[in-house]
A protein has these predicted regions:
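Low-complexity, intrinsically disordered or signal/transmembrane-proximal segments
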Residues: 6, 10, 21, 25, ...
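Polybasic, lysine-rich low-complexity intrinsically disordered segments
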Residues: 22-23, 30, 34, 47, ...
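N-terminal Rossmann-like NAD(P)+-binding domain of SDR-like oxidoreductases, especially those catalyzing
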Residues: 57-63, 68-257, 301, 307, ...
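C-terminal substrate-binding subdomain of Rossmann-fold SDR/epimerase-dehydratase oxidoreductases
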Residues: 12, 99, 106-107, 133, ...
Length: 438
C-alpha cells in the first residue's frame, strides 16, 4: 500500500497492463522515472528535492501526483557541505545546521598552521565531519562533493581581503571566481544538479563605486577591486548555471557582518581589540584608514540564518543580506571605546583626523596612509526589503550597539586572558632561570 503526506496515489494497474497519460497525472511502468521535483525511494522511504521518481512495485503500475501546496523540504535529515567552515560565517552556520539536525561536513585546507579555533568545540560530535579540499583544486572539490553527496552546499570559502586582492590578484581570481565554477561543475558532472542546492556567498563590494543608495538586488554592479571583480564572476556564473542547467543555486549579496569571531585583520576587530588593549595598558594608539567610510554592519550570527533560509524556498533567487542601516568607521570607534569607559572626540579631517580621549587629551586614533585603499568604497548601504518580505528574515535582531558591545566584551576577556598567560610564562622563565623549578 502506498502512503504519503506529500503525494497521493492516482492509479494502480496490475500485471503490467498499459497505462494512460493525462494532463493531471502520468502512469509509469519503468521503475526509474522523472516526476516534477521530488525523489521517492520504494514509495515511502525518502522524499526530498530532486527530479527523479523511483518506484519499485514489482509488476504493479503506479501513478503518483504531488499534493498541491503541501510539499516541504524539511521531511528528512539533510546533509550540508560548508566550504570555509573554519571562518567566522562557517562556524556559526555549522552550529545553526547542527541545531536543525543536519549532518554537517566542512572543508579545510592542508596547512602548516591550524585554523580550527572557531570550530574546536564542534569536533568530535557524531554529525560533524571535516574533509581536506581546496577551491583551487578541481579534483579535491569533485572528490569531497562526490563522497558527501550533500543536499546543500554553502560556499563561504574565499580570499576575502580587498587590500590583499591588489597584492595577489591572480590568487584571488582563482579562488573567488574559478573556485565557484569548480563547485558548480562538480555538482553537474556528478549528476547532482537536481538534488543539490547551492548557496554562494557574494559581497556588497560588487556595487563598488555606488550608483544608487541604498543598494538592492537590481542595483548595477561597479566593482572597484580585484576582489570585487572576482566575486562578480562568481555571482554571474551561479546565475548562468541556474538558468542553463535549471540548478537550484543562488547568491546572497552580503553586506559587512561582524562578530566576536571576526578575523583580527578586519577593521572592526582591529578597533575592538585596540580598545580593549588600550584600556588595559597593552597598546598606546590605533592606526586606521578613512574614518568617514560608511558601512552597513550586521551580526554574522543573524546573517547565517538568512543563508539557510535562501536555500529553503520553492525557487532559487538572489538576495541582499543587510541591515538597511549605515554607520561610519568613526561611529564604530566611538561606541567601542565608550564600552570600555573612554569617551572619544574627533578633530581634523581626512588624513589629519584624530580620535582623542576627552578625559586625558591623549591621541588614541590616527589615520595612516598605509591603510588607505587605492580605490576606496565609501557608501555601502543595503536594502534588505526582499529578504524580509520573501524569507521572513529579521535583519535587526542584533542592534549596531549590541554588536559592538559583544565584540568589545569578548576582546576585553581575551586581552585579560592573554595577559594572565603571559604573566605565567614570564614567572615560569624566571623560576627556571633561578633554578626554583626544574
Amino acid at each position: 500500500m502506498f502512503s504519503s503526506t506529500y503525494f497521493r496515489l492516482q492509479e494502480a494497474i496490475g500485471n503490467g497492463l498499459p497505462g494512460t497519460q493525462e494532463n493531471t497525472h502520468r502512469d509509469f511502468r519503468n521503475p526509474l522515472q522523472t516526476f516534477d521535483s521530488c525523489l521517492i525511494l520504494n514509495g515511502r522511504e525518502r522524499i526530498s528535492s530532486s527530479k527523479t521518481l523511483i518506484i519499485n512495485y514489482n509488476l504493479y503500475l503506479c501513478t503518483i501526483i504531488r499534493r498541491k501546496n503541501n510539499f516541504k523540504r524539511h521531511t528528512m535529515k539533510k546533509t550540508a557541505l560548508i566550504t570555509g567552515i573554519t571562518g567566522q560565517d562557517g562556524s556559526y552556520l555549522a552550529e545553526l545546521l547542527l541545531e536543525k539536525g543536519y549532518d554537517v561536513h566542512g572543508t579545510i585546507r592542508r596547512s602548516s598552521v591550524d585554523f580550527r579555533e572557531r570550530i574546536a568545540h564542534l569536533e568530535g560530535r557524531p554529525h560533524f565531519h571535516l574533509h581536506y579540499a581546496d577551491l583551487s583544486d578541481s579534483m579535491s572539490i569533485l572528490g569531497v562533493i562526490g563522497k558527501v553527496r550533500p543536499d546543500e552546499i554553502y560556499n563561504l570559502a574565499a580570499q576575502s581581503h580587498v587590500q590583499v586582492s591588489f597584492d595577489s590578484p591572480e590568487f584571488t581570481a582563482d579562488v573567488d571566481a574559478v573556485g565557484v565554477l569548480r563547485i558548480l561543475e562538480a555538482v553537474r558532472q556528478l549528476g547532482m544538479a537536481a538534488t543539490c542546492r547551492i548557496y554562494q556567498a557574494s559581497t556588497s563590494e560588487l556595487y563598488g563605486k555606488v550608483e544608487e543608495v541604498p543598494q538592492n538586488e537590481n542595483t548595477p554592479f561597479h566593482p572597484y577591486s580585484p576582489y570585487a571583480v572576482a566575486k562578480q564572476y562568481g555571482f554571474w556564473i551561479v546565475r548562468e548555471y541556474r538558468e542553463a542547467y535549471n540548478m537550484y543555486c543562488c547568491s546572497g549579496i552580503l553586506f559587512n557582518h561582524e562578530s566576536e569571531r571576526r578575523g583580527e585583520t578586519f577593521v572592526t576587530r582591529k578597533i575592538t581589540l585596540a580598545a580593549a588593549r588600550i584600556k588595559q595598558g597593552k597598546q598606546d594608539k590605533l592606526y586606521l584608514g578613512n574614518l568617514s567610510s560608511l558601512r552597513d554592519w550586521g551580526y554574522a550570527k543573524d546573517y547565517v540564518e538568512c543563508m539557510w533560509l535562501i536555500l529553503q524556498q520553492d525557487k532559487p533567487e538572489d538576495f541582499v543580506i543587510a541591515t538597511g542601516v549605515q554607520h561610519s568607521v568613526r561611529e564604530f570607534c566611538y561606541h567601542a571605546f565608550k564600552r570600555v569607559g573612554i569617551e572619544l572626540e574627533f578633530t581634523g579631517e581626512g588624513m589629519e583626523e584624530k580620535g582623542i580621549d576627552k578625559a586625558t587629551g591623549n591621541v588614541l586614533i590616527e589615520v595612516s596612509p598605509d591603510f588607505y585603499r587605492p580605490t576606496d568604497v565609501v557608501n555601502l548601504w543595503g536594502d534588505p526589503t526582499k529578504a524580509k518580505a520573501k524569507l521572513g528574515w529579521n535583519p535587526n535582531s542584533t542592534s549596531f550597539e549590541e554588536l559592538v558591545n559583544l565584540m568589545v566584551d569578548s576582546d576585553m576577556a581575551k586581552v585579560a586572558s592573554d595577559g594572565a598567560a603571559e604573566k605565567v610564562r614570564t614567572n615560569l622563565e624566571e623560576y627556571l632561570e633561578k633554578g626554583i623549578v626544574k
